[in-house]
């Protein structure tokens, strides 16, 4: 006896199943073979009993609702139901029709065993056959009549054989032989189904192979993810490096362009603005020391080197009335043009006029306030009266010209201190300052001329410009004029008064206070430094002492040097 049959017997005893229920449980067991025809015939005979019928049908419906793993219980229960419908009581077919929905649900029965085979296909096919049989009344009647005839024949054959043989038990071969055609057909179907299952069963692989396959797949996936992350990181770093290189290249190109622009672009030199409207001076290649601009429009001249070793003067203030700083020369408001270079003209006399030569290059200055390089008036009148910001210079009043920009278009006419504009012999104005007593700036040129060597060429060392003084204009006859009286600042002259004229008849009455006549004898007076230095003739006695405004005075003057040779006679009236 098998283990499954022993377990069924134990359950039958425990649950106290009836004889009919035990037979149904035996016919619908989980064994791999189908129910025997004799057992099914006995159950069909019990269906005619009302009590046994209810027990049989309740157990069959219980087997039909079993779990998927007990698919054999379901399949054998449907086989037993079909047999009972054909050979059992009519109440079986009637109850099956009433509970047809329970059979119809089995059309969707699903179960796949561990080997991957679908075992629910047999249940689904059997359910379709039962539903079709229950719905077709004619077929049901025919099948039922045929099954009953077959059962009767089998019963008669069995009775005759049993009577002939005797009361001995039939052999085992006869017990295994199907008792009816239905049972034989059922066994044949079961055998075919089982053989088909065994043929369709694929070779199963061991669990170790599945584990190794899953492990290999997971390792391959991890390696792929790692390589993808590394590739993305490399792409990101490469992109950042390319952007950084582009930024550095752009910065280098911009800096190179700026360097080239700085190299090839020369900044424009600052141009000194002329407050009197004079033309801007042409810049030269020779560097000139920083000096105050000439307020009267005189061209700037680089100072020459001092042959006596004097300290290089520094630029002075442009105010003609304020004393200059002790460390540099003062700006001459009457400053002449620069001396010509070597080989271009004679060297000017340091004690004479500085307008003997004109600059070689550049247009002449059209400043109305600058002295002309040569004045043809034998009476010595100055071309114009200099003024500073509308104030009187040297004690003579002049009104500022509002059309100073147009003065360069007309010729400057000599004027005198009188309102009538008469030409006077000595009516020309003199600068408010006389050269300093110790100013030896012009000695270098005269010494170079006397020795016969050309003056030193212009060097970057700044030298003071050549000054034009009344003594240089008058020459040796400067003693005929009282320079101190002319330089001093007398009170304002009335507009209607005339300046003194030495050629005016003695009988003509003066119209107002006149300036002191230099030709009239005067009481003796103290000699001034200018008279001691420049006058070869004793000064006119009786001249009152006057204030001398030094142009370069103050501390830090160069040491006193012996005067140079007297300048040649330039007065056309002296024979």
From Swiss-Prot:
An annotated GO cellular component: nucleus
InterPro entries associated with the record: ENTH, ENTH_VHS, UIM_dom
Ranges for the Sequence repeats: 274-276, 294-296, 306-308, 319-321, 332-334, 349-351, 367-369, 377-379, 501-503, 517-519, 571-573
Modified residue annotations for Phosphoserine: 382, 418-419, 434, 446, 453, 472
A GO MF label: molecular sequestering activity
Pfam families: ENTH
Taxonomic lineage: Eukaryota, Metazoa, Chordata, Craniata, Vertebrata
Motif [DE]-X(1,2)-F-X-X-[FL]-X-X-X-R motif, chain ranges: 401-410
Function: Binds to membranes enriched in phosphatidylinositol 4,5-bisphosphate (PtdIns(4,5)P2). Modifies membrane curvature and facilitates the formation of clathrin-coated invaginations. Regulates receptor-mediated endocytosis.
Subcellular location: Cytoplasm; Cell membrane; Nucleus; Membrane, Clathrin-coated pit
Keywords: Cell membrane, Coated pit, Cytoplasm, Endocytosis, Lipid-binding, Membrane, Methylation, Nucleus, Phosphoprotein, Repeat, Ubl conjugation
Modified residues (Omega-N-methylarginine): 533
Binding annotation for a 1,2-diacyl-sn-glycero-3-phospho-(1D-myo-inositol-4,5-bisphosphate): 11, 25, 30, 63, 73
Native species: Mus musculus (Mouse)
Family, per entry: Belongs to the epsin family.
Gene3D superfamilies: 1.25.40.90
Stretch list, region 8 X 3 AA repeats of D-P-W: 274-379
Domain ENTH: 12-144
Residue span, UIM domain: 183-202, 208-227, 233-252
Compositionally biased spans, kind Low complexity: 157-167, 279-299, 306-316, 332-346, 367-379
PTM statement from Swiss-Prot or TrEMBL: Phosphorylated on serine and/or threonine residues in mitotic cells. Phosphorylation reduces interaction with REPS2, AP-2 and the membrane fraction. Depolarization of synaptosomes results in dephosphorylation. Ubiquitinated.
Protein name: Epsin-1
Membrane topology classification: Peripheral membrane protein
UniProt keyword Lyase present: no
Domains: entry comment: The NPF repeat domain is involved in EPS15 binding. The DPW repeat domain is involved in AP2A2 and clathrin binding.
Start-end of Pro residues biased regions: 453-467, 556-569
Sequence segments annotated as region (Disordered): 150-186, 264-575
Assembly and oligomerization: Monomer. Binds clathrin and ZBTB16/ZNF145. Binds ubiquitinated proteins. Interacts with RALBP1 in a complex also containing NUMB and TFAP2A during interphase and mitosis. Interacts with AP2B1. Interacts with UBQLN2. Interacts with ITSN1. Interacts with AP2A1 and AP2A2. Interacts with REPS2; the interaction is direct. Interacts with EPS15; the interaction is direct. Interacts with ENTREP1.
Name of the gene this protein is made from: Epn1
